[in-house]
């Protein structure tokens, strides 16, 4: 439980009731969710698989993965977000097992249980991302997949993800991101390697403010996704 930023938990808990409003502060998550789901599902087909979403928040990705036939669990440290996630299951009719627990504590209790682990838009919000990466590696079965997404750290990502997204375009509330916590792909790849995960693929995610469209492409300067696999 030590690897937690209380201010980050409080920030997202305050907005918890708005998780499932597609026009709220979480609009970007709703818009990128189909891209994230398709990207994961094409690399590690989810139907019939046991999947864990680390830092699941209100359950946007967790529910989507359940919707394509996965048996999904979601963990988070925001009690309010999890309450919203559980309530939304009544509306969607989907089945997800949510639990209030850290990745590290959950890994100690459930080592090697999951075919696929996702950890999306979460690493940049914790004090020790390497600890979360290591926990994800412990949670996945040998040969299983772990998928991450986070923000690169450079001048361009600061201008677009912080200044642009939070202050100019107002896609996100001010203070959503702390630039100092952004993670370069090479840094994340090293964390993964040290945890026993081999990086299989790196993909960028871009946003066009004119067309208001998100795309997956080669540009990893700002947002990126990383597919890793535990050694069999």
Swiss-Prot record:
Pathway: Cofactor biosynthesis; ubiquinone biosynthesis
Function: O-methyltransferase that catalyzes the 2 O-methylation steps in the ubiquinone biosynthetic pathway.
Originating gene: ubiG
EC number: 2.1.1.222, 2.1.1.64
Protein name: Ubiquinone biosynthesis O-methyltransferase
Reactions mediated catalytically: a 3-demethylubiquinol + S-adenosyl-L-methionine = a ubiquinol + S-adenosyl-L-homocysteine + H(+); a 3-(all-trans-polyprenyl)benzene-1,2-diol + S-adenosyl-L-methionine = a 2-methoxy-6-(all-trans-polyprenyl)phenol + S-adenosyl-L-homocysteine + H(+)
Top-level taxon of the source organism: Bacteria
SUPFAM superfamilies noted in UniProt: S-adenosyl-L-methionine-dependent methyltransferases (SSF53335)
Alphabetical list of HAMAP family matching this protein: UbiG
Family: Belongs to the methyltransferase superfamily. UbiG/COQ3 family.
Sites where the protein binds S-adenosyl-L-methionine: 36, 55, 76, 120
GO biological process, one term: methylation
Keyword terms of this UniProt record: Methyltransferase, S-adenosyl-L-methionine, Transferase, Ubiquinone biosynthesis
InterPro entries: SAM-dependent_MTases_sf, UbiG_MeTrfase
Gene Ontology MF annotations: 2-polyprenyl-6-hydroxyphenol methylase activity; 3-demethylubiquinol 3-O-methyltransferase activity; polyprenyldihydroxybenzoate methyltransferase activity
Keyword Methyltransferase: yes
Broad class of enzyme this protein falls into: transferase
Organism lineage string: Bacteria, Pseudomonadati, Pseudomonadota, Betaproteobacteria, Nitrosomonadales
